[in-house]
Structure formats: structure tokens, C-alpha cells
Swiss-Prot record:
Its EC number is 6.3.4.21. It comes from Bradyrhizobium sp. (strain ORS 278). This is Nicotinate phosphoribosyltransferase. Catalyzes the synthesis of beta-nicotinate D-ribonucleotide from nicotinate and 5-phospho-D-ribose 1-phosphate at the expense of ATP. The modification Phosphohistidine is found at residue 242. Pathway: Cofactor biosynthesis; NAD(+) biosynthesis; nicotinate D-ribonucleotide from nicotinate: step 1/1. Transiently phosphorylated on a His residue during the reaction cycle. Phosphorylation strongly increases the affinity for substrates and increases the rate of nicotinate D-ribonucleotide production. Dephosphorylation regenerates the low-affinity form of the enzyme, leading to product release. Pfam families: NAPRTase, NAPRTase_N. The gene is pncB. It is an enzyme of class 6 (ligase).
């Protein structure tokens, strides 16, 4: 394995276009899994995705050159799935299952391209939207976020000398390795990379994945990044995301349909994957509401991915719910992935490792932790909270309530309606950093 000298490559960067996204597999695995289901059940649905910068103090419109942003987005639209990539998707085993993707779906992917985008500036921020069929706009989420984040990183490093860059990356590497040394001590740890969307850059994510693979050995279970999984012979990790219940809810004709929407689309997911990949994401409209109204069959699923509630609180609540349904939590799985870092992983592991099966998705704090690493003390490389969410479905506003009101998205009037239907119980406002 050849280790890239990232500092030298950054210093020598001077060509007209250094593509940030070079493959459509440079995305999260669950985007492909969801895409296959979307194409089956919602082939004609029109859905808009929008990039949202929750870190308002960082004025991306002032930091990132619009011409460079357009060039990267335009380049991404030229990429197609390669024959090699499609053969790998067809022949690889995912979660112990062969032929995860149907021949018809893979044939359709062969002609796939990202749709057009809409971009303009307002109040120092970029407004970046993707309109069109859900089968196409969904695939913009990860490359759009990766492009914006890496352009910001490149801008922050412009003008730094060769040795300053060398020190920057040396400190970041040492910082990550110190985390690895702590995580090694956790018996039975299962951890994967979830850091594509808000990474510092592709080369840095690749270095992090290769380092953690060596440092944690069998405790490192894989990566959500499909390209890195293919290139490094790792498991591709992922199930589903908030966009599924958000779209289903936006399509609901009345409040009763709205209340049942999260379960209807999970049932469609179950049909698509024949009982595999049964990890539910409960917090789109509040975890308490999800558990309160869940059909009994949800308790038979493999587990949950608590995403926005305080993790200890969420874990306790879900374990209690399983017990109330007569299920043994020790046979169930909790996947924690919300802003995980070494301290929170240690705390959750200590609290729950003897009560339930645990897995961790390590995201931004794995692939973009340069806090305190800059030789000049700059904070321009500190990570920001950047998301790409469904904002409308067939012209109707989409909503995410979340267990944390700071993460809520949608039209205020629609948010109020959703709160009337789902309630506000269990929602806790906490600061969002990544």
C-alpha cells in the first residue's frame, strides 16, 4: 500500500481542476440501498434536496469561490459508473448477502448521471438546490457535501508553506492515532467509518480509514464509503436515512396517514431487502412518538440507530421499549452515530456493552478533526455542521422534527402541524457542532 504525502500534494496543488469527486461510488452505501428502493416504489416522485449550513457564523459564500464550486459540481455531473464498479456491486457480498442489487437496477445505474443544480448566493451563504426525480436528486447529497467541505478546507490551506502543512497533517495524524490507542482498550468494540459527507478531503479520509483499519484490526468493521470499501477490501456499511420518512410524510393526505408514514416506508424497505438490513432510524419525528405508535413488527427488527437524542437517554429508552415488547435487548443492536468521538464512544460502551449489541459510526470527528492542529492557531479548518436535506416533495414542504429541535428543518407552519400530530415529548435542545 502506497501512503500519499498529503502535505506535499496540498502544497503542490496548482492545476486548473483537481476533482474532489472522481467516482459515483464515492458516496455512502445507504444512498445506493435507498436508491434501489426508491426506484421500485417511487420512480416518478419529484423531490428537492437543499444544502443547509447550520454553522451560520461561517459565511461559505465569502469563503468558497463560486467559480470553483460550479466547476466541481459540473465535473461531478460528467461522471458515470464504470464497468469495474458495476461488476463489483453485482458480485460482492454485502451483509452476508449475494446479489444485493438486482440486474435491472445495475443496468439502470450504467446510464445514471447526476441531474442539474441550482446555485446562488444570499446573505453570505450559498443556496444550493437539486430539483427533479427522487431517483436522481438523492444521489447529489453526499458529493455536494463533500465538495463544499473540501473546497472550504482547500481555501483554509491556501498560502500555507510546505513545512506548515507538514506540521498540520502530522498533528492531525497524531491526534487520530491517540484516539485509536484509547479505543483499542474497549473490549468487543465494533466501529465503522461514517465520515464521507463532512470529511476534510478524500485523501485524508482514505488515510484515516487505512490507519484505523491497521490500528483497530477486527474492531474496525468497515466504511460507509463505497469506493473506499471496494479499494480497501472492507465491508460497505449502511442501511437507511431520514429522507425516507420525510418523503413519505410529505406525501401523506391527512394526519392519520402522516402518523403512519414512517412505518409504511419501513415496510417497503423490508419488502425490498427481504428481511435484511433491518435497522430503524426512529428520530425523524421524535423517538418517543416513533416508539409509541410503532406496530409490533418493528420490535422484531434487528435494531435501531438513535441519531439526535442524547445517546445514553436514547439507548435507555429503546432498551426499555424492547423489554416492554417482550424482546431480549441482548439479542438486539444499537448503532450510535451522532457526533461520535472517543469520549462518547467510551461512555456509551461502558454503559451498554453488557445490555445490548453495540456498533458505532464514527463520522466527522474521525475524518475532519483538525481542531488545534493549525500551526498559526487558525480555526478555519474546524468542522462545520453542513447537511443536505429533503426540502420539498411534489411541491409540498418536507419536515424533519428530530429529537433535537436545533436539527429541525422545514416550513414553520408545517413543523407546527407535525408537532400536533407527533407531539413534542422527549425532544431536547442541544448545541449542534457537526
Amino acid at each position: 500500500m502506497t501512503v500519499t504525502d498529503i502535505a506535499s500534494r496540498t502544497y503542490n496543488h496548482g492545476w486548473r481542476l483537481d476533482p474532489i469527486v472522481r467516482s459515483l461510488l464515492d458516496t455512502d452505501f445507504y444512498k445506493l440501498l435507498m436508491l434501489q428502493m426508491i426506484r421500485e416504489f417511487y420512480p416518478d416522485q419529484k423531490v428537492t434536496f437543499s444544502v443547509i449550513n447550520r454553522t451560520k457564523r461561517v459565511r461559505l459564500g465569502d469563503v468558497i469561490d463560486e467559480g470553483e464550486l460550479r466547476a466541481q459540481l459540473d465535473h461531478a455531473r460528467t461522471i458515470r459508473f464504470s464497468k469495474k464498479e458495476l461488476i463489483w456491486l453485482a458480485g460482492n457480498t454485502f451483509y452476508g448477502k449475494t446479489h444485493m442489487f438486482s440486474p435491472d437496477f445495475l443496468a439502470w445505474l450504467a446510464n445514471f448521471r447526476l441531474p442539474e443544480y441550482e446555485l446562488h448566493k444570499a446573505d453570505g451563504q450559498y443556496e444550493l438546490h437539486f430539483h427533479g426525480l427522487w431517483t436522481h436528486t438523492t444521489m447529489w447529497e453526499i458529493p455536494a457535501l463533500a465538495i463544499v467541505n473540501e473546497l472550504r478546507s482547500r481555501q483554509a490551506m491556501k498560502g500555507q508553506g510546505r513545512f506548515a502543512l507538514d506540521v498540520l497533517f502530522a498533528r492531525a495524524k497524531a491526534k487520530l492515532w491517540a484516539k485509536v490507542e484509547r479505543l483499542r482498550k474497549l473490549e468487543g468494540l465494533r466501529l465503522s467509518d461514517f465520515g464521507t459527507r463532512r470529511r476534510h478531503g478524500f485523501l485524508w479520509q482514505r488515510w484515516c480509514v487505512e490507519a484505523v483499519k491497521e490500528g483497530l484490526g477486527s474492531s474496525f468493521t468497515g466504511t460507509s464509503n463505497v469506493l473506499l470499501a471496494m479499494d480497501n477490501d472492507l465491508e460497505a456499511i449502511g442501511t437507511n436515512a431520514h429522507e425516507l420518512p420525510m418523503v413519505a410524510a410529505a406525501l401523506a393526505k391527512d394526519d392519520d396517514e402522516l402518523r403512519f408514514a414512517p412505518y409504511r416506508i419501513l415496510d417497503q424497505w423490508r419488502q425490498t431487502y427481504a428481511g435484511n438490513l433491518l435497522i430503524a432510524l426512529p428520530d425523524a419525528f421524535g423517538t418517543k412518538a416513533f416508539l409509541r405508535d410503532a406496530p409490533d413488527w418493528v420490535a422484531d427488527w434487528t435494531g435501531f440507530r438513535p441519531d439526535s437524542a442524547p445517546p445514553i437517554q436514547a439507548g435507555e429508552e429503546i432498551i426499555a421499549w424492547w423489554k416492554s415488547k417482550g424482546r431480549d435487548p441482548r439479542q438486539k443492536l444499537l448503532v450510535f452515530s451522532d457526533a461520535m468521538d472517543v469520549e462518547s464512544i467510551e461512555q456509551i460502551h461502558q454503559r451498554f456493552s453488557d445490555q445490548v449489541r453495540l456498533s458505532f459510526g464514527w463520522g466527522t470527528n474521525l475524518t475532519n478533526d483538525f481542531v488545534g492542529c493549525s500551526p498559526d492557531g487558525s480555526v478555519d479548518l474546524d468542522p462545520i455542521s453542513l447537511v443536505c436535506k429533503v426540502t420539498s416533495v411534489d411541491g409540498r414542504p418536507a419536515v424533519k422534527l428530530s429529537d433535537n429541535p436545533e436539527k429541525a428543518t422545514g416550513d414553520p407552519a408545517e413543523i407546527a402541524r407535525y408537532l400536533r400530530v407527533f407531539g413534542d415529548a422527549g425532544r431536547v435542545r442541544t448545541p449542534v457542532f457537526v
